[in-house]
Amino acid sequence: MISYKIQTKDQLSLHVQQWNETEKAKGTLCIIHGLGEHQNRYTHVAKFYANNGFQVFSYDQRGHGKSEGKRGHTPGLYYNLDDLERVLKSLPNHNLFLYGHSFGGNVLINFLLRKKPNFIRGAVLSSAWLRLVKKPKYLEFGIAKLMHKIMPSFTQNNKLSSVDLSNDRQVRLEYDNDPLTHNQISLRLFLDFYLAGKWALKNADKLSVKTLMLHGADDLLVCKSGTELFAHKNTKYVEYTIFEDTKHEPHNDNKQADVFEYTLAWLEKIISTEASHSNLK
């Protein structure tokens, strides 16, 4: 594994990892982690796709893992989108796929919709933060909007419990004892990405990148109806599947093997379909 740094536009250092070197790789996969976690929680995910012919990269988002920045804070949505863009510029663009989970899925879908990159072959959205199960109350939301203008970097406990992540006890124990996970979220991060999720749903029909959406049927953090609505609003480019007996992290739960194989088959289908079209030209 090779590690390197990428500098953000506000001079933070982001920790990037290249998981393998593969000659004649099928494609490149970049993993974007969720809130309060870090890229090394995806070691098994990276190894699976590396063992199946993909060159795999990942990075710790600002304020997470080994990257710099206040824990759980961002100056704004577009900083995260710019961070992702800078990371992608350092990667091979041969059959480039992006894989974003939860908060990382929110970053990814907004990157695709707002930046409109023309070099992405496909995207995988895992439990993408589009709608929250526990919506903020009107008064709480109003107070947060007011406070974020005064103290945007103020952080508080995100109240995320590992019990809601997975049915697998070992996954929960490792999360709770991981020194690189944290439970912080700033007012700015919450408001920007809460609104960005709503915006993405309204603009779902504008997505023009082949996308696979995955969600656990028993997710108590991010509402599966957001995934279903987004997919139904863009049947041309989006496919989705709901995994039963699965909580917030499909890649870490009872259907893990099914999730891996289903996603791999989809990636390979996109590659082979594009190759067939190229041969016909």
List the predicted regions and their residue ranges.
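N-terminal cap/lid segment of alpha/beta-hydrolase-fold proteins
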Residues: 1-23
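Active-site glycine-rich loops that stabilize anionic/oxyanionic intermediates
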Residues: 34-37, 217
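Catalytic nucleophile-loop/oxyanion-hole region of alpha/beta-hydrolase
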Residues: 36-38, 65-91, 95
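Conserved alpha/beta-hydrolase
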Residues: 46-69
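Alpha/beta-hydrolase-fold enzymes
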Residues: 97, 103-186
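Short beta-strand/loop motif that positions the catalytic acidic residue
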Residues: 207, 213-215, 219
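Short alpha-helix in the alpha/beta-hydrolase fold that links the catalytic acid
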Residues: 209, 223-232
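Catalytic active-site module of serine/aspartate enzymes centered on a nucleophile-bearing elbow/loop
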Residues: 237-281
